[in-house]
A protein has these predicted regions:
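Extracellular, repeat-based ectodomains that mediate carbohydrate processing or recognition
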Residues: 20-571
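C-terminal outer-membrane/trafficking sorting elements
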Residues: 1-7, 11, 15-18, 577-667
């Protein structure tokens, strides 16, 4: 057993000077550690009234000459507050293609459930591929308040799926399956119980309710690992954690459920599996996934079990996994994935940081690439392809000076797919996109990039999505867009970022009502594929007040974001520029006219010093801003109308010796 001090966020600025460390960071290094994994059990009953955030973006209509495809977004269910989507669960949204259904599972309350309780569960469902929804169907109701303010069976962060009997094509014969923690207090504090059951889609009056408290050697926490296989296994993984003594018990709790037709419900059993973490003291996150035939499965955690080499004397997280080839009955492992060092993944060791980034990050003497320590971030997602190979969607970056922290300086972290093509003997890393901002803070809750992975129907292609605030001045991930990139591991082709062929991820919510406010998004494990080679990836996010998460939220469903096979292209090999030319493009600002804040994009072929000058029509300078050195790639920059009277202005972007001028109008 290991005594575990629950991790809290740490943002540090300083030189890392620790014993037995082989290199030092420059003084402006920014790093973070994992959030408290116990999450919030009892939310505030009321909150101080707050004004809706001034940063809350309204729907932006792009100019007619702009080649963009704004997604269609509709309102579906509601919830009493924003906490329900707050955890690391990755099964809030489920697609069941044989019945053309997609469901969103959440806690109740909000505008569609007046007076509803956040300890109850419900769902929203479409059986026509996401075009029309029936919302706020309640399936679980807390009833045991034991004389207190909060009900002991109040349900929290849910996992869910659609159980569709083999060969069925009628949604009425399918069931919603759910499994989550509750507040029965059997594991110390508020936590300790599980709430689970099923609900008939065809007969909404039929739903089951089952409760299981911590017992014997089983200490229940908040399971974030869930999958429902094609063979009908409902698989949950939790850590065995004694809250009263703040002790991780070096075990995972494997919870298997099978459909019992006699009781029209899933019946579960529990089993403990050894999972010692002597380095990190516990895991940061856990996931489980199976191949499309349900035969090959992986349980994967982020942790440090002292098996991996940690170069440079720094401590970080890495993937540790167990594998099953008999439909989840037995598990082999643990195995670990070496990210860094001489035996690490080449795509990380030799390609994650550029020479320029290494020079800017470390004090002399500059370490060799093989001596730089890398870590995963603190949440992730996994999928298993049609050949039984695991894909790990995770954010990686250099390990910080503090143990189990990650450098979060802009563009030093990236969303990647770590995958194998031979069952786990060899591992590769393919970058999906650079990340500008890591963590968002919303009142008393926070979330990181929430990276997720969605498979095509045949599990041959994968779509990795995450949240990022792509505004140059932003220091936190508080105004997130949804980014996504598709990857074909057989051909190594990836999707283009936009119609111009940008080598990077696609901004799903660009110019939509979700732009810069796609809070706590969720993606399904599998996408729709109505036409062969057309991949419709549904997303759900919370429309919420970012300053006050206790306020009711509206769930928003993105209906029509798609990739096609034609979007997958061979990525060009980047050339090393040796001349002095500066190739940069500056967009027209949007919105325009504006009052408040407007934005423009700057595309740099290579890094350079950038500044901004705003002047009147007569040439009088009224404002200047120096952005310093910006790296190559896309940058979203902002202009404020504060202290600018209504009128017409020019903004000039200076990129090295190049100048680009555009006209803007302040209302």
């Amino acid at each position: 057993m290991r005594k575990l001090l629950l991790l809290v966020m740490l943002t540090g600025f300083g030189i890392a000077t620790f014993a037995q460390k082989s290199y030092q960071f420059r003084i402006d290094t920014k790093e973070m550690k994992a959030l408290d994994r116990t999450l919030t059990s009892v939310e505030p009953l009321s909150a101080v009234p707050l004004t809706k955030s001034d940063k809350q973006a309204k729907r932006i209509t792009p100019p007619a000459d702009r080649d963009v495809n704004i997604v269609s977004i509709i309102s579906i269910g509601t919830s009493a507050n924003a906490y329900g989507y707050y955890g690391n669960q990755r099964s809030y949204v489920w697609v069941e293609s044989p019945i053309n259904a997609v469901s969103n599972f959440h806690r109740m309350g909000g505008a569609l459930d007046p007076g509803g309780y956040s300890g109850d569960y419900g769902y929203d469902i479409s059986t026509d591929g996401g075009q029309n929804f029936t919302n706020e169907i309640e399936v679980y109701k807390a009833t045991n308040n034991a004389g207190g303010t909060y009900y002991l069976d109040a349900a929290r962060y849910p996992n869910h799926a659609i159980y569709n009997p083999d060969g069925n094509t009628d949604p009425a014969n399918a069931y919603i399956v759910f499994f989550g923690p509750n507040l029965d207090g059997s594991n110390g504090g508020s936590w300790g119980g599980y709430s689970y059951g099923v609900a008939s889609i065809g007969d909404t009056s039929y739903h089951t309710k089952n409760l299981l408290s911590s017992h014997d050697d089983f200490y229940h926490l908040i399971p974030s690992a869930y999958d429902l296989t094609s063979q009908g296994l409902s698989m949950v993984v939790d850590i065995n954690y004694d809250i009263a003594n703040s002790t991780y018990l070096d075990q995972l709790n494997l919870i298997r459920g099978y459909w019992d037709d006699n009781v029209k419900d899933f019946v579960y059993t529990e089993e403990l599996m050894d999972a010692e973490m002597p380095g990190s003291g516990s895991t940061a996150d856990e996931k489980v996934a199976f191949s499309p035939d349900g035969q090959t499965g992986y349980i994967c955690v982020l942790g440090d079990n002292d098996m991996a080499e940690q170069p440079g004397g720094f401590k970080g997280y890495y993937p540790i996994y167990w594998k099953s080839t008999d439909a989840g009955q037995t598990w082999d492992g643990p195995y670990f994935i070496q990210l860094d060092g001489p035996n690490g993944i080449g795509g990380i060791v030799y390609h994650h940081l550029t020479d320029e980034q290494i020079e800017n990050l470390f004090e002399p003497p500059i370490p060799a690439r093989e001596d730089i320590n890398y870590t995963t971030a603190f949440d992730f997602d996994i999928a298993v392809d049609n050949n039984g190979n695991m894909h790990i969607a995770v954010v990686i970056g250099p390990t910080g000076g503090n143990e189990y922290s990650i450098i979060t300086t802009k563009n030093y972290i990236a969303a990647v797919d770590i995958f194998t093509n031979d069952g786990g003997t060899t591992w590769f890393a393919e970058e999906m996109g650079r990340i500008e901002n890591f963590r968002g803070n919303f009142g008393d809750i926070s979330c990181d990039n929430r990276i997720q992975i969605t498979a095509s129907q045949d599990y041959s292609k994968f779509f990795i999505s995450w949240l990022d605030t792509d505004i140059e001045d932003a220091e936190e991930n508080n105004q997130p867009n949804i980014f996504i990139r598709g990857f074909d591991p057989t051909t190594y082709m990836k999707t283009q970022g936009d119609a111009s062929g940008t080598d990077g991820p696609t901004n799903v919510t660009l110019f939509s009502e979700g732009m810069w406010q796609a809070y706590f998004f969720a993606a399904p494990k599998v996408c729709f594929e109505s036409d062969k080679g057309t991949y419709n990836i549904p997303f759900v996010y919370e429309d919420m007040d970012p300053n006050d998460p206790i306020q009711p939220v509206q769930f928003k469903y993105i209906q029509d974001f798609t990739f096609t096979d034609a979007d997958f292209v061979i990525q060009a090999i980047k050339k090393h520029e040796t001349d002095a030319r500066t190739n940069a493009t500056v967009s027209q600002n949007f919105p325009n006219p504006f009052n408040g804040t407007t934005y423009f994009t700057l595309s740099l072929e290579k890094g350079n010093n950038v500044s901004l000058v705003i002047s009147t029509l007569t040439g009088q300078q009224v404002s200047t801003k120096d952005y310093g050195y910006l790296t190559s790639g896309l940058h979203n920059l902002s202009i404020s109308s504060n202290n600018l009277p209504a009128g017409v202005y020019f903004y000039t972007v200076n990129i090295g010796n190049q100048k680009v001028t555009r006209k803007m109008i302040v209302e």
